[in-house]
Amino acid sequence: MVKYSREPSNLTRSAKAYGAYLRVHFKNTYETATAIKGMLVKDAKRYLNDVIERKRCVPFRKFRGGVGRCAQAKAFKHTQGRWPEKSCKFLLDLLKNLESNAEVKGLEQSKLRLEHVQVNRAPVGRRRSYRAHGRIIPFLSHPCHVELIAVEDEDHVPRHTSTEKRVVKLNKRELARMRLRTGKSLS
């Protein structure tokens, strides 16, 4: 069994999915996962499909060295963005797994929200590249581990707005400041 870095806030109303040693770039997957954090699962799937079709971009915030600018990043109040297709496909597969895990638990698909999304570095895959004049240089891959936790949203009850005036309780310091400002005693 895989150990998650965090437990969900409500064990009975949550579903988990984990991908280990995924042969996909860590940095691209990190940025893509950060973009979908906090979304509903159905919205995240729609967003990732839009990225694959290049209708929307993934904003690059942390690993942005050498990343070109794109106009689609303005939607995220950013300037740099890309369309990491392979990362999106891997995350879509994990979201599909997450949905089936939620279905087994009897959770409602339309209310699932991604509470926790984490991407960690996996051990580097080492290969060789043979160059001119007998040189050999490393040819590395940077895979990753991804963990997702989705929690079913609760139905929010609207707050009751009363017409009565609320009584504000002040501590001694606040009372003293009010007395100094107004020059009167409040008690």
Swiss-Prot record:
Keyword Iron-sulfur: no
SUPFAM superfamilies membership: Ribosomal protein L22 (SSF54843)
Record's keyword annotation contains rRNA processing: no
Protein's GO biological process: cytoplasmic translation
GO MF: structural constituent of ribosome
Pfam families per record: Ribosomal_L22 (PF00237)
Xref: CDD domains: Ribosomal_L22 (cd00336)
Keywords: Ribonucleoprotein, Ribosomal protein
GO CC annotations on file: cytosolic large ribosomal subunit
Family under the similarity heading: Belongs to the universal ribosomal protein uL22 family.
Name of the protein in its database record: Large ribosomal subunit protein uL22
